[in-house]
UniProtKB/Swiss-Prot annotation:
Organism this protein belongs to: Cavia porcellus (Guinea pig)
Residues passing through the membrane, by range: 112-132, 587-607
Side Cytoplasmic, residues: 1-111, 608-682
Name recorded for this polypeptide: Epithelial sodium channel subunit alpha
Protein's gene: SCNN1A
GO cellular component, one term: motile cilium
One GO term (biological process): multicellular organismal-level water homeostasis
């Protein structure tokens, strides 16, 4: 039996209104052709066998099967955590993950592999934490390189080691010497001059002449400490230097005399020198700004002979400056020279050789108690710090100084606390030179001196518009200075923390050798030649001259450079090694793990969003609800079969199916009329 289904208009939910079926039995082909096509029988129920059934009682017609491919979405997510975990374990390249799902019927194996996988995962990330901790600690490695080339000869500064009595302050220094001699007689009964006690002037109080006289200060006895049973408490091994009942010093007070203290020394010699130095600084400060220029002592009065690389020196090879304590200083091969000296050969004959005069005529004996000269070696663009890096030359001795150059390159930023040029240091550079740590420290002290005391210390440069300290204009500057010096020594000012080390440093390591010069056999003709050459008679031959040789011991110089111990490449290599060790995976496996975590996060957010919508939000009414109902596919059909896109929304009531009468029994297919199944009007 053949059945032909005639489609009818359907409702908005996608179900047909009805169908009419014609049953064909044993009709022959020619009869069917003669009869022609049967007209459709509307509103009739389908026939089952030779009977006509009511609409809706039979099975619903199914759509014709068509081989269509479902379109894949651009982004698809799994519906549950279980499905996501199952997919990840079955498809990942991480070793051991498949064991979590392949043995699901054996819970013991599954638990064993789960614990083993988690422990391995934890160990790997513990190693990761150690590697990241090492990387972010920014360790450095020191690389030592040995180079050989022509070297630039450093700058050499030589000072007379005693200030000269300049004409601007000669009278004031003479008065200070007279008062000092009177003080020595009063305190120690020392008579430096036979005429010191002549006249009543020597008997008057020193307070009438100087505001801060040197005096005896009684020492308070220290209280005895009770004996302790603690065996760790031992007797002080540093006994008091001065066991007398008094010390030598001078009193300093603040501006309103409300606070005073005594600046004392354990030695009488040190106390007298400190007191004389304090008043000498005041005298220098009074004339430092008014004097247009300190008179320069001629080079021949201090340096008898100068030779570099076996060639005589010229006036263009040195510059002069004055130091408050060390007197006239001369710098050879400084940055102001037209051409720098180059050392192409090592050895004593290829360096700087100086013959110095060390006699001290008309100098200040109370300010400097040593004889000779002072020398320091530094870079061309660095100032000469005679107090910090200099050393003394002994008269009657030839001092040979050999040098070795070393360069240090530090890493800045996160790898080290250094500065490239000092621009990021919160201290103004007061020196006309490049940044060094010593320059910064002295500038920091001068800044605090100006800020707290209102004047500048004469030993260091000062900014414009600031005057040097003296007790004529700043009566309490000594009190402020010594208080500030104590705070500076204990680093209470923070200068050592502010002044960072430079990243690039060039240093010269020095080693000295000494020999007697001139020898007893040659001293007569040498002194005679020096006297004739310089038009100067050396009174004390042995103590009147000294010789200095400075040269490179070798042209090989060492470069110490820092480099990161753990770079980004090293970190990635170590991370990859750990990942391969514990899981035997690659970078793509890491991407798979990241994808798994991303999917897990998205699924969690979608579930939370669905729960939020079901609890706090309900769909609208009317046509919107009708469209949602119409677009809801049956459970047996995929979601792409939606009727609202193909059929209009139902706006009229459905037909009255109760008015449709049943078809009468068919007598014969041959004489059946198409009108027999015609619908009746309601």
């Amino acid at each position: 039996m053949l059945m032909r289904l005639l489609p009818l208009p359907s409702l908005t939910d996608g179900r047909p209104l009805g169908c009419c079926c014609t049953c064909q039995g044993s009709m022959k082909g020619d009869e069917l052709k003669a009869q022609g096509p049967l007209p459709p029988q509307p509103l009739q129920g389908p026939l089952k066998g030779d009977k006509c059934e009511q609409p809706g009682l039979g099975p619903e017609p199914t759509a014709p099967q068509q081989h269509t491919e479902e379109e894949e979405a651009l982004i698809e997510f799994h519906r549950s955590y279980r499905e996501l975990f199952q997919f990840f374990c079955n498809n990942t390249t991480i070793h051991g993950a498949i064991r979590l799902v392949c043995s699901k019927h054996n819970r013991m194996k599954t638990a064993f592999w789960a614990v083993l996988w988690l422990c391995t995962f934890g160990m790997m990330y513990w190693q990761f934490a150690l590697l990241f901790g090492e990387y972010f600690s920014y360790p450095v490695s020191l690389n030592i390189n040995l180079n050989s080339d022509k070297l630039v000869f450093p700058a050499v500064t030589v000072c007379t080691l005693n200030p000269y009595r300049y004409k601007e302050i000669k009278e004031q220094l003479r008065e200070l010497d007279r008062i000092t001699q009177q003080t020595l007689f009063d305190l120690y009964n020392y008579n430096a001059s036979s005429t010191l006690l002549a006249g009543a002037r020597s008997r008057r109080s020193l307070a009438d002449t100087l505001p801060y006289p040197l005096q005896r200060i009684p020492v308070q006895p220290e209280p005895r400490r009770a004996r302790s049973s603690d065996p760790s408490s031992v007797r002080d091994n540093n006994p008091r230097v001065d066991r007398r009942d008094w010390r030598v010093g001078f009193q300093l007070c603040n501006q309103n005399k409300s606070d005073c203290f005594y600046q004392t020394s354990s030695s009488g010699v040190d106390g007298v020198r400190e007191w004389y130095r304090f008043h000498y600084i005041n005298i220098l400060a009074q004339v430092a700004d008014t004097s247009p220029r300190w008179e320069e002592e001629t080079l021949g009065n201090f340096i008898f002979a100068c030779r570099f690389n076996q060639a005589p020196c010229t006036q263009e090879n040195y510059s002069h400056f004055h130091h408050p304590i060390y007197g006239n200083c001369y710098t050879f091969n400084n940055k102001n020279d037209s051409s720098l000296w180059m050392a192409s050969m090592p050895g004593i004959n290829n360096g700087l050789s100086l013959t110095l005069r060390t006699e001290q005529n008309d100098y200040i004996p109370l300010l400097s108690t040593v004889t000779g000269a002072r020398v320091t070696v530094h870079g061309q663009d660095e100032p000469a710090f005679m107090d910090d890096g200099g050393f003394n030359l002994r008269p009657g001795v030839e001092t040979s100084i050999s040098m070795r150059k070393e360069a240090l390159d530090r890493l800045g930023g996160s790898y080290g606390d250094c500065t490239q040029d000092g621009s990021d240091v919160p201290v103004q550079n007061l020196y006309p030179s490049k940044y060094t740590q010593q320059v910064c420290i002295h500038s920091c002290f001068q800044e605090n001196m100006i800020k707290q005391c209102g004047c500048a210390y004469i030993f260091y440069p000062k900014p414009k518009g600031v005057e040097f300290c003296d007790y004529t204009n700043h009566s309490a500057w000594g009190y402020c200075y010594y208080k500030l010096q104590g705070a500076f020594s204990s680093d209470s000012l923070g200068c050592f923390n502010k002044c960072r080390k430079p990243c690039n440093v060039t240093i010269y390591k020095l080693s000295a050798g000494y020999s007697r010069w001139p020898s007893a056999a040659s001293q007569d003709w040498i002194f005679q030649m020096l006297s004739l050459q310089n038009n100067y008679t050396i009174s004390n031959k042995r103590n009147g001259v000294a010789k200095l040789n400075i040269y490179f011991k070798e042209l090989n110089y060492r470069t110490n450079s820092e480099s990161p111990s753990v770079t980004m490449v090293t970190l990635l290599s170590n991370l990859g090694s750990q990942w391969s060790l514990w899981f035997g995976s690659s970078v793509l496996s890491v991407v798979e793990m990241a994808e798994f975590m991303f999917d897990l996060l998205v699924i969690t957010l979608l579930m939370l969003l669905r729960r939020f919508r079901s609890r706090y939000w309900s769909p609208g009414r009317g046509a919107r609800a009708a469209r949602e109902v119409a677009c809801t596919p049956p459970p047996s059909l995929p979601s792409r079969f939606c009727a609202h896109s193909a059929f209009p929304t139902l706006t009229a009531p459905p037909p009255a199916y109760a008015t449709l009468s049943a078809c009468p029994p068919l007598q014969g297919l041959a004489g059946a009329s198409s009108a027999a199944c015609a619908p009746r009007e309601p």
